[in-house]
Structure formats: structure tokens, C-alpha cells
Amino acid sequence: SQRQKTAKRFRYSKTETGRSDMKIFIPETEERASVFLSGEDARHLFAHRPQPGDEVFCGDGQKNNYKSKIEKITKDGIYILIEEKIPFSPPKAEITLYAALLKGDKNKFVIQKSTELGVSKIVFFESENCVMKLDKKKKNGKKERFEKIARQAAMQCGRDTLPEIGDFTD
């Protein structure tokens, strides 16, 4: 039907540089290696309706980027084959954003937008007028959640590096 043709045609696109817009982060690996993705990374790729043979752009978030292809799709996840390492271009400037803790989901918005804009490090602090106050137990949980949000935002915008979420300061 026409709807299926349209859905298939817009499965994913390539950028001006020829890179696939399907970007995922994987551990550092070697060329010609097969990597199994499950969980959130697999769900991110499933959203693009991948097919075996589709190109995927991978990175380790630190210093390596990889050109790869989808080998096999199973109900448990996706197997991708790393074809080659791609030269990594470091950012021209290291930008650190210091932001006061905000209430609600506003911190999530700050992390997403600053990641998309290329910020290298995000440090949240508690100011005198902050409504949100965190005890030591909550700080670790929040930092993990913020790192997860930054990773998702970096995958969404196709960024090469992951921003560092600094320790909470007073």
C-alpha cells in the first residue's frame, strides 16, 4: 500500500557528509568486530525501522567513531558489524556550563539543549535560593540519570562525544 511505501522510504536518512543519522554509542572496539546491542540502544535503532545492511554510525563517546552495518535483527536485539574506524575531529572549544539545580524536569531540558549545542561538561550546583536540595544518596542517582539523558541527547543529535556531567557542587 502507499502508506507502507512511504514508511519504508523515510526509514532513515543520511546527512550531507554521507553519515547515517542512526547514531549509537558502543564500547571501544576493533574493526571487523561484531557488536550486540540490546536495551535502550536497540530501542533507539528500532525507532528508525532498520533493515539488515543499513548503515549505522557508532562512536565510543571518547575518541573513536566507526562506520558499521546492521548484520542481523533478532527479538532480543541487533547485531552490528564494525567496518572501519573514522577519523575523530575533537571539538574546537571545551565549554563548561554551570547551572543551578532547577525543580521538575527543567534540568533535563538544560542537559538536552546544552548537549545539542556542544557543551563538553555540565556542572549543577545548589545555590542559596535553590528550591531543589539533594542529600548525598540522591546526588548519585541524579548524576546517573543526568548522564543517561545526556547520552540520549547525544545519540539524537548525532554528536561525536558525550558531555561529562560533573559532580554536584555547593
Regions found by a protein language model. Name each.
Residues F10-R11, K72, A154, G158:
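Short intrinsically disordered, low-complexity segments
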Residues Y12-F88, K139:
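N-terminal positively charged helical leader segments and presequences
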Residues F88-D170:
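RNA substrate-binding interface of SAM-dependent RNA methyltransferases
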Residues Q2-S13:
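Extreme N-terminal basic, low-complexity initiation segments
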Residues R3-Q4, G39, K136:
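Residues at structural and domain junctions
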